[in-house]
Curated annotation (Swiss-Prot):
This is Large ribosomal subunit protein bL35. One of its GO terms (molecular function) is structural constituent of ribosome. Keywords: Ribonucleoprotein, Ribosomal protein. GO terms for biological process: cytoplasmic translation. Residues 10-22 have a biased composition (Basic residues). It comes from the Bacteria.
């Protein structure tokens, strides 16, 4: 059996946590920030966990994580 390839884009976007979940950076914090409220930008700053519905897709993309 050949090795399963890791999706490199996913490897750069997701980090595995100690309990087996995955964390990711929020979207909407790259450009056009002047019209966004400070509160909105502040809440987008911390990392978020991948939701249960998307977890299977992320695990499939990162077989060795």
């Amino acid at each position: 059996m050949p090795k399963i390839k890791t999706v490199r884009g996913a490897a750069k976007r997701f980090k595995k946590t100690g309990k087996g979940g995955f964390k990711h950076k929020h979207a909407n914090l790259r450009h056009i920030l002047t019209k966004k409220a400070t509160k909105r930008k502040r809440h987008l700053r911390p990392k978020a966990m991948v939701s249960k519905g998307d977890l299977g897709l992320v695990i499939a993309c990162l077989p060795y994580a």
